[in-house]
């Protein structure tokens, strides 16, 4: 069994016996965290990584997270997605790409990090952003989506 420094309630942790896993010291998982590491995957966590409530990490290929990185509520990390094809769903496989997150990062609530992304060191990502391309070190990322407000017809 994987031993975490601090663990909240009701986690779902599924790590294949053939996965390559490295955990740093003082890793904290709050409540309702989901961690899945597949059979051919590599998953590495640095020291003092903190996952707040309701985070989900799905590793089928390679996810690496540097030391002293914090994740807000509801963060999702995926190193794979479904491959689109016209086949029946049971025949569809995954497209995979590594996710590398540097050290000393702060990932805000409800951020989604997609496959094939490298996030440098000392990065802050604001709440609700969808990260689908690389972020250089020492950056601040905010999701700037316009709010469309229309009058409701009577």
Positions of PLM-derived features:
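Short helix N-cap motif at coil->helix boundaries in the Bergerat
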Residues: 133
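A generic "structured core" feature
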Residues: 114, 120-130
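Gly/Ser/Thr-rich helix-start
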Residues: 109, 127-129, 144
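Glycine-rich NAD(P)-binding loop of Rossmann-like domains
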Residues: 90-101
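Conserved SAM-binding loop
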Residues: 64, 84-86, 118
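Domain-scale signature associated with acetyltransferase and cell-envelope carbohydrate enzymes
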Residues: 1-78, 102-104, 111-113, 121, ...
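Short, flexible, glycine-rich and Lys/Arg-enriched loop motifs at helix boundaries
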Residues: 40, 83-92
């Amino acid at each position: 069994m994987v031993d975490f420094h601090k663990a909240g309630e009701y986690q779902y942790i599924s790590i294949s016996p053939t996965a390559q896993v490295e955990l740093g010291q003082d890793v904290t998982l709050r409540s309702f965290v989901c961690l899945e590491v597949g059979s051919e995957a590599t998953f590495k966590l640095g020291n003092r990584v903190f996952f707040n409530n309701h985070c989900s990490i799905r590793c089928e290929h390679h996810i690496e997270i540097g030391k002293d990185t914090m994740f807000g509520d509801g963060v999702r990390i995926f190193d794979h997605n479904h491959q689109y094809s016209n086949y029946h769903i049971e025949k569809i496989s995954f497209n995979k790409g590594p996710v590398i997150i540097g050290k000393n990062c702060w990932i805000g609530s409800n951020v989604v990090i997609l496959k094939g992304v490298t996030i440098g060191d000392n990065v802050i990502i604001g709440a609700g952003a969808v990260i689908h391309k690389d972020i250089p070190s020492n950056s601040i990322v905010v999701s700037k989506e316009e709010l469309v407000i229309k009058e409701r017809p009577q």
